[in-house]
Design a protein with these regions (language model features):
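Acidic, glycine-rich two-metal-ion catalytic cores of nucleic acid-processing enzymes
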Residues: 173, 183-284
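N-terminal leader/targeting and assembly helices and adjacent pre-domain segments
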Residues: 1-183, 275-361
Length: 361
């Protein structure tokens, strides 16, 4: 018979798959909206360029002619933002209810489970730093505002470059919109669509995690902490691999998502029955899924990766880190700092000079 922590670990993995399917459905609706807008943008860009002879080109003139383009783009992204905000608000309500019902159905009836304030959690999700990149992190609401301005600037710059280079109108439009023969995958708009896809997936993961962490905090008396759970496959980032399986106190630790399109999640770690004052057998070690089937829940990413080929190890870690991993038995978590940030090779070399020397690197 499964223990509570075992059941919760299984549920966390299954639930993350459901959230991925949900985010994909939101993405499809957003892309359909943007595709409809892109047709209008193509017509407006063509009309603007036809009214802008190369000999009369000025930045001010271009900006004036692109007013309708900017307006159409702004309206489209207002609709995108509204759709995302509505979906995320509904997601908070769903996730809060899901976690509450999961605990209610999994824990003994003697245990009292607390619910979260959905409005407060949604506000926290919008305000919590979200975009993890070389530029740092910003709150989700600020991230959403920046999407529209970013695409508008790319459109303007592409047109400006084309006019300065003396390119014909159809070539400029193709650069922005893409070509039909390639299903428009070669245009700037496709880049924007991919950006939106990554943002939506990460926003869903971010919002679900904020809801979970707030739920954990409300039920802190029941929990030892929370566990970082990364997907065990060759696409997992070094950052997530280094954190997988680690347990952190409630309210602290590096939380998922760690990067755009992050697939990591979290699971609560219930206190022992003795600590909860309940006379039941202690929880045992659980199991969770990898692409290879069932693996122990206490199996770290390093243990999983050591069973893979050198090519898989190098694909995930890079050639230098892969060699260190194999020859010196360095665990994956040694390639990151305490916050899960990947150390550069120079930083690793300074920190592990002797190991680099032994490996002949």
């Amino acid at each position: 018979m499964q223990t509570v922590n075992e059941q919760l670990a299984h549920e966390a993995i299954d639930h993350s798959i459901d959230l991925t399917r949900y985010s994909n459905s939101v993405i499809r609706r957003i892309i359909a909206l943007l595709n409809r807008t892109d047709r209008d943008l193509a017509n407006q860009i063509t009309a603007a360029l036809e009214r802008l002879p190369a000999e009369s080109f000025t930045v001010e003139r271009l900006d004036s002619l692109l007013q309708s383009v900017r307006q159409t783009n702004a309206v489209a992204y207002q609709q995108v933002t509204q759709l995302i905000e509505t979906e995320l608000k509904d997601l908070v309500q769903y996730e809060a209810a899901y976690q509450y019902q999961l605990f209610q159905s999994t824990l003994p009836v003697q245990v009292s489970v607390a619910a979260v304030n959905v409005g407060q959690v949604y506000a926290a999700a919008l305000a919590r730093p979200f975009s993890i990149s070389k530029d740092g992190a910003v709150p989700l609401n600020e991230y959403l505002k920046g999407i529209e301005a970013n695409r508008a600037a790319k459109i303007r710059n592409a047109i400006r470059m084309g006019v300065i280079e003396g390119e014909p109108t159809d070539k400029i439009v193709r650069r922005i919109m893409g070509t039909k023969s390639l299903n428009y995958a070669d245009g700037l708009m496709e880049e924007s669509r991919r950006h939106v896809e990554g943002m939506v997936r990460t926003a869903v993961s971010h919002t679900a995690d904020v809801t979970r962490q707030n739920f954990y905090a409300e039920n802190n008396d029941l929990l030892k902490g929370w566990q970082f759970v990364a997907t065990l496959d060759s696409r997992t980032s070094i950052t997530c691999a280094s954190l997988s399986g680690k347990i952190f106190p409630i309210g602290s630790g590096p939380r998922p998502p760690r990067h755009i399109n992050c697939r990591s999640t979290s699971t609560p770690v219930i206190r022992s029955w003795k600590e909860l004052g309940i006379d039941l057998p202690e929880p045992m070690v659980g199991t969770r899924s990898s692409m290879d089937g069932q693996v122990p829940a206490d199996l770290t990413f390093s243990k999983w990766l050591r069973g893979k080929s050198a090519s898989v190890q190098d694909d995930i870690l890079g050639a230098t880190r892969g060699k260190l991993f194999r020859e010196n038995k360095i665990d994956v978590d040694k390639f990151t700092d305490k916050k899960g940030k990947v150390l550069t090779l120079d930083q690793l070399r300074k920190k592990n000079a002797e190991l680099f020397k032994k490996a002949g690197i």
